[in-house]
């Protein structure tokens, strides 16, 4: 996570005076951290992590690998991954840039492994899909809403979220973005949007 002093420092680096940087840092942070889900957080975390990304991308290129990052998920991919040589260097770069590697989230996958990266399943090397467990969860919620009604479904699962339907439509839009040919996702979006108009 990125703490407010680093955010404040980022604003100073790009030219804001100390007092303005302090106010902007306070506005962009919640409980002294960049909050997940805020529209400002991705851009600020990318600015803060720029130097780390540059160093890790250069390291990956040395070994013929590709480096990508989404939020705090770092991915190195390639045909051969020399663990013993590259991992210590990755950890050093991360720590040099004042971040801490999360060992619990470190995974190594080979060609036959089930690969889920940033919530997307990578099948057959190139095909992107939503994990089956996520599809089952979405299908179940859509089914109960369309057969029992939104209010009854929310009562049954104990949800008081006024934006529940919008969130479910958002999940389906995400599914459709990953799998554009998936007719279930498109049909469900249309059905839930019709239902939404009645609320």
What do the predicted segments below correspond to?
Residues 37, 41, 62-79, 119:
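Catalytic palm active-site di-aspartate
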Residues 21-29, 62-74, 105:
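Short, surface-exposed recognition loops or helix-turn segments adjacent to catalytic cores
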């Amino acid at each position: 996570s990125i703490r407010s002093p680093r955010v404040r420092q980022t604003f100073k680096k790009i030219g804001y005076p100390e007092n303005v940087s302090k106010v902007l840092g306070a506005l962009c942070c919640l409980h002294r951290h960049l909050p997940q889900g805020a529209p400002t957080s991705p851009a600020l975390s990318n600015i803060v992590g720029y130097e780390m990304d540059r160093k890790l991308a250069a390291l990956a290129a040395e070994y013929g690998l590709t480096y990508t990052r989404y939020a705090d998920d770092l991915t190195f991919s390639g045909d051969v991954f020399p663990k013993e040589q590259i991992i210590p260097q990755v950890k050093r770069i991360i720590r040099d840039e004042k971040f801490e590697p999360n060992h619990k989230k470190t995974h190594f996958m080979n060609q036959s492994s089930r690969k889920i990266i940033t919530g997307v399943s990578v099948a057959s090397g190139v095909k992107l899909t939503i994990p089956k467990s996520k599809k089952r969860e979405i299908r179940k919620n859509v089914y109960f809403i369309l057969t029992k009604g939104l209010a009854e479904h929310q009562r049954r699962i104990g949800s008081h979220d006024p934006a529940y339907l919008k969130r479910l439509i958002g999940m389906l839009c995400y599914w459709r973005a990953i799998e554009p040919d998936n007719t279930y996702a498109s049909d469900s979006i249309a059905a839930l949007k019709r239902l939404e108009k009645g609320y």
